[in-house]
Every structure is written in C-alpha cells, then in structure tokens.
UniProtKB/Swiss-Prot annotation:
Key words of the record: Cytoplasm
Pfam families to which the protein is assigned, alphabetical: YNR034W-A-like
Keyword Cytoplasm (UniProt): yes
Miscellaneous comment: Present with 2820 molecules/cell in log phase SD medium.
Protein name stated in the entry: Uncharacterized protein YNR034W-A
Organism: Saccharomyces cerevisiae (strain ATCC 204508 / S288c)
GO annotation, cellular component aspect: cytoplasm; cytosol
Phylogenetic lineage: Eukaryota, Fungi, Dikarya, Ascomycota, Saccharomycotina
C-alpha cells in the first residue's frame, strides 16, 4: 500500500485549491475553494502540522469534497477533489478504505 498519494494523482481531479503561507495566511484560492475559503481549513492544517511535517501529506473530508493537503516550499496547498460516492477508480488516501 502506498504511504501517500503523489500530487500527480491528485492534480488531474482537482476542482479547486487553497494556498497558505508558513503562518497559515491565505495566499490564493481557485475553483470551488473560492466558495469554501472561509472554512476552518487553515485551523485544520495548523492542528495537523505534525502529520504534514512527518508525511508531507494529509487528508480532510466533508460532504462534497476531499481536501488533499501538501507542504511544499514553505507553503501549504490544499487541492480539492470531488467526493466519489462509490470510490470506484479512485485510489483511496492513506487510512481511508472503501
């Protein structure tokens, strides 16, 4: 089993993104993230910084989207992919099974 999903597998399915600096200040939004930018994502990233530092990857899920957080060059980038109800054809993130 993979220890994480490579960013190259997430990007083709991404429908939005949020980018934060090292102080968790929002720098950029795109796609569906423009609607959800006021969500507690920055707080979630702050609380899970240890996991991001250890693995370089973390997953957040809500009713509609899966947020894939990556730490890159001092920034935190969250790519959102649609939640696939039956998850067929989707590689599940670490810790999430069908």
């Amino acid at each position: 089993m993979k220890s994480s999903i490579p960013i190259t597998e997430v990007l083709p399915r991404a429908v939005g993104s949020l980018t934060f600096d090292e102080n968790y200040n929002l720098l950029d939004t795109s796609g569906v993230a423009k609607v959800i930018e006021k969500s507690p994502i920055a707080e979630i990233i702050r609380k899970s910084n240890a996991e991001l530092g250890r693995l370089g990857y973390s997953v957040y899920e809500d009713a509609q989207y899966i947020g894939h957080a990556f730490k890159k060059a001092g920034h935190f980038i969250v790519y959102f992919t649609p939640k696939n109800k039956n998850r067929e054809g989707v590689v599940p993130p670490v810790g999430i099974t069908n």
